[in-house]
């Protein structure tokens, strides 16, 4: 078997890799490293095929940095060091691509196989049975067969094909000749020279295009061809590959933040099941924890979350039988630290009572991943978890809110540690065949739990030093609030649900009859094809969006054209009823626990923006905008002697935006409690505020939220049912009135380009990827996100802090009022009737002062026996 020579087109790999790895990837020092990561990842992938005998990376001696993005330029300085850490020799030479080609040819001449790593399509012409090209951006290895399939010509004709078709700015190609035309010319005439010689016989569009470029084609061909005869800066024999020093490479990767590429050789986790209390004591000693029952000098305090976290911090992972923590059967718990060892205690083990004492010991510092669910499940097993100092899910969310969402442990471990956790589905099965944890051999259950605990520990220690400790502390306290909310839950009246279902069924039939009357004939409303035919072919309504097979009839698409015809609003309402009956009501019934309450799960780390998500059931799907939704809200009731109280921020988005922008056109009216939607409508319609109607105000509201969200004229036109020109005029008038809002959004986009992230009011970093994408749609989306993300994330900060401050203040005041739900800007509390006035005062005050904004926050307070029957009240 031949030796292999690895040839890396380093500058090319760096510049092109910048476009495919999100620019929010940063080193521990905050420096951009996305392009360097692309280089390292590509070489790691190639080395996984087969270790080379020789390895060389060619750097462009005098690279032309014109047009390089600002975040890319500083990464060039670190390229040589990175390559050398990978064991690759580095040479500098002008005309990088030709020197790469020459090294590849020299390797073949010396009897080696070769693999070229780069992103330039010209490397495809080098491919042979003994030479592969690896396109790092596509993660694709090209053999002669794959080159022929990709370019429709063999490797020997790729240069001619590229000369005609072109490839980015370096190879403009021939105008009017695409991939199919180039293949036709080359196959029909054997070569470009043959095509030019027979030019008089080539008719049609291809002939015209080739004739127009007759003088340019030879020059394009010269650009496309690689010269394999360039002098080699360093002889091939001097470029022997030696595997790098793993410790030094890991140290570099740790500094650069390349956790996925860290070497974990020898990191296999050894998991020991504990049968007795003595086994557990010995295991805890090996993990570096204090013995059970030995008091610490002080109770641990939640958390600083940095390298100075309390010594002996142990990560735990519980095996739960049901995904709903309040119903979860607890099978066992694994403990791990950074020692390469873990232990597992089954609930049936004699070691369990000793483990419970450790779990409830507030002086024993503990870590975990998504510990809200674990804490709730332990509570229902009679265990009060204490001493938690950190949650790796929070560290992941605060480090990379978007890239690693939804931040479940297998995904985060893959990204941060480069480690694949055991596949539970492969071990337990799926569906009805799924095995219970307690039916598995204990060593298999222990291995899964132990590796998960070890991963949680490793993720925490890798990420927590990169996150503001104050934010980690805030999220840690928030998790205590969420545990109490999950444990409390909300009472649901099943009889009210039954009555709602019957009423919805009757109304659904009535709506279907009205829809068919407007259509002029019966049809299957539930059929996208038939509905689309009625709306877009028969009624000629505007098409809001398309799918691969035609027009879209999704809810989002229909909401954009709701103004166009009365039938659309009826269809939307019919669909809502159908969904409520078929899924939501049944789901809600299934979620009612034995105590008559639904215990929704809360996830503070799953949304990019930071707003709280709830599931099982998702109570955010019960807004009170329609009579049907109000009917469902009526099923949520307070127990005897208590009421439900809602504290809701008033126009929170506008108050936060006023603070961020300091725009007088926002600040001054909000200080006077003016209706901002009326003022916006007056501005964009160029009319006095006194003349604004209810419909006009709705237009102002749509313009406000659409523009704050960074939408363009096309999207706004669809929402309002106006022409794109009219929408542009509305936006122009909006920008004229709120000039500092637009300036603020422009500045956020600039900062996102410069830093790779935005910063919210609470100091959270939200990385924005895709700003340098070659895909116009991806780039446009990233730009809109960058414009709105600071505002959107800051609104979530206020909502989260408001919930936390309200719960903290109520407990400090000794009140029995508890929060039970948060949906966006609203917090719902369960309140003893006797303390309603005081609870309203305490909660409202705390939420108003969650952040001190330019214009003080305003909250509304309502209370009543059900969620649907809330009426305004005044606090004490």
Language model region names:
Residues 213-347, 430-630, 637-643, 650-653, ...:
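Conserved "right-hand" nucleotidyltransferase catalytic core of DNA-directed polymerases
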Residues 93, 116, 524-526, 818-823:
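Short beta-strand
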Residues 72-233:
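Extended two-metal-dependent nuclease catalytic cores across DNA- and RNA-processing enzymes
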Residues 90-91, 141-168, 270-272, 306-309, ...:
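Active-site-proximal helix-loop-helix substrate-binding element of RNase H-like nuclease domains
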Residues 506-513, 517-569, 736-788, 792, ...:
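C-terminal polymerase-core module
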Residues 1-67:
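Non-catalytic, usually N-terminal nucleic-acid engagement modules in DNA/RNA processing proteins
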Residues 435-438, 480-487, 542-544, 593-607, ...:
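Conserved catalytic core of nucleic-acid polymerases
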Residues 14-23, 124-129, 333, 372-382, ...:
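Short active-site loop/helix that positions an aromatic residue
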């Amino acid at each position: 078997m031949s030796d292999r020579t690895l040839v890396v087109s380093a500058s090319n790999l760096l510049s092109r890799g910048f476009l495919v790895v999100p620019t929010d990837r940063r080193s521990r020092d905050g420096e951009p490293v996305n392009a360097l990561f692309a280089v390292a990842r590509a070489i790691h992938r190639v080395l996984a095929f087969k270790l080379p005998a020789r390895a060389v990376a060619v750097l462009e001696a005098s690279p032309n940095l014109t047009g390089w993005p600002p975040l890319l330029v500083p990464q060039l300085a670190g390229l040589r060091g990175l390559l050398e850490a990978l064991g690759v020799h580095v040479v500098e030479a002008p005309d990088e691509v030709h020197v790469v080609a020459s090294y590849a040819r020299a390797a073949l001449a010396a009897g080696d196989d070769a693999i070229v790593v780069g992103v330039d399509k010209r490397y495809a012409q080098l491919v042979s049975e003994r030479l592969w090209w690896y396109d790092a951006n596509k993660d694709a290895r090209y053999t002669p067969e794959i080159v022929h399939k990709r370019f429709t010509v063999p490797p020997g004709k790729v240069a001619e094909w590229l000369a005609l078709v072109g490839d980015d700015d370096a190879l403009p190609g021939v105008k009017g000749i695409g991939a199919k035309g180039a293949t036709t010319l080359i196959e029909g005439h054997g070569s470009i020279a043959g095509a030019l010689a027979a030019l008089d016989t080539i008719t049609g569009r291809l002939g015209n295009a080739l004739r127009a470029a007759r003088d340019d084609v030879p020059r394009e061909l010269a650009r496309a061809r690689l010269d394999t005869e360039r002098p080699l800066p360093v002889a091939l024999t001097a470029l022997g590959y030696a595997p790098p020093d793993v410790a030094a490479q890991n140290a570099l990767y740790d500094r650069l933040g390349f956790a996925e590429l860290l070497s974990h050789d020898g990191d296999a986790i050894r998991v020991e099941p504990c049968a007795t209390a003595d086994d557990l004591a010995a295991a805890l000693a090996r993990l570096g924890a204090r013995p059970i029952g030995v008091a610490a000098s002080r109770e641990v305090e939640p958390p600083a979350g940095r390298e100075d976290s309390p010594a002996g911090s142990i990560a735990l992972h519980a095996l739960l039988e049901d995904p709903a923590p309040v119903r979860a059967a607890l099978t066992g718990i694994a403990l791990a630290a950074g020692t390469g060892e873990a232990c597992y205690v089954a609930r049936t083990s004699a070691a369990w009572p000793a483990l419970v004492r450790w779990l409830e010991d507030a002086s024993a510092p503990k870590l975990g991943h998504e510990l809200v669910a674990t804490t709730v499940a332990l509570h229902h097993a009679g265990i009060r978890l204490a001493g938690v100092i950190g949650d790796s899910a929070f560290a992941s969310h605060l480090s990379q809110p978007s890239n690693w969402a939804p931040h479940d442990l297998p995904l985060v471990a893959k990204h941060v540690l480069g480690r694949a956790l055991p596949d539970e589905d492969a071990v337990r099965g799926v569906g009805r065949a799924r095995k219970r944890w307690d039916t598995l051999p204990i060593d298999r259950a222990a291995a899964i739990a132990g590796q998960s605990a070890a991963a949680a520990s490793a993720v925490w220690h890798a990420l927590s030093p990169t996150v503001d400790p104050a934010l980690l502390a805030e999220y840690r306290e928030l998790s205590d609030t969420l545990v109490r909310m999950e444990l409390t839950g909300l009472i649901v009246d099943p009889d009210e649900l039954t009555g709602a279902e019957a009423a919805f069924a009757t109304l659904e039939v009535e709506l279907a009859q009205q829809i068919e009357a407007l259509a002029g004939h019966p049809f299957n409303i539930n059929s996208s094809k038939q509905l689309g035919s009625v709306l877009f072919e028969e009624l000629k309504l505007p098409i809001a969006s398309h799918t691969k097979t035609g027009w879209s009839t999704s809810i989002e698409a229909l909401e954009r054209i709701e103004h166009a015809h009365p039938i659309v609003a009826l269809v939307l309402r019919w669909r809502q009823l159908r969904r409520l009956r078929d899924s939501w009501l049944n789901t809600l019934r299934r979620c009612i626990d034995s105590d008559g309450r639904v215990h929704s799960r809360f996830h503070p780390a799953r949304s990019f923006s930071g707003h709280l998500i709830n599931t099982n059931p998702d109570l955010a799907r019960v807004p009170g905008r329609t009579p049907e939704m109000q009917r469902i809200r009526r099923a949520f009731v307070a127990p005897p002697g208590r009421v439900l109280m809602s504290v809701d921020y008033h126009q929170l988005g506008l108050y936060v935006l006023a603070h961020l922008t300091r725009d007088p056109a926002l600040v001054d009216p909000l200080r006077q409690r003016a209706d901002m939607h009326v003022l916006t409508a007056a501005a964009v319609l160029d009319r006095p505020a006194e003349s604004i109607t209810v419909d006009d105000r709705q237009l102002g509201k749509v313009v406000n939220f659409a523009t704050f969200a960074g939408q363009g004229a096309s999207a706004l036109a669809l929402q309002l049912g106006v022409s794109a020109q009219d929408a542009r005029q509305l936006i122009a008038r909006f920008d004229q009135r709120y000039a500092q809002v637009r300036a603020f959004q422009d500045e956020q986009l600039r900062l996102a380009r410069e830093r790779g992230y935005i910063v919210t009011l609470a100091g959270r970093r939200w990385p924005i990827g895709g700003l340098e994408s070659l895909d116009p749609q991806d780039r446009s989306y990233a730009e809109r996100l960058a414009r709105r993300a600071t505002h959107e994330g800051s609104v979530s900060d206020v909502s989260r802090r408001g919930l936390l401050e309200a719960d903290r203040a109520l407990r400090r005041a000794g009140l029995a009022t508890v929060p039970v739900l948060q949906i966006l800007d609203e917090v719902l509390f369960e309140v003893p009737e006797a303390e309603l006035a005081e609870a309203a005062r305490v909660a409202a005050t705390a939420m108003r002062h969650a952040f001190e904004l330019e214009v003080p926050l305003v909250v509304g307070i309502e209370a009543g026996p059900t969620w649907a029957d809330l009426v305004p009240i005044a606090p004490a």
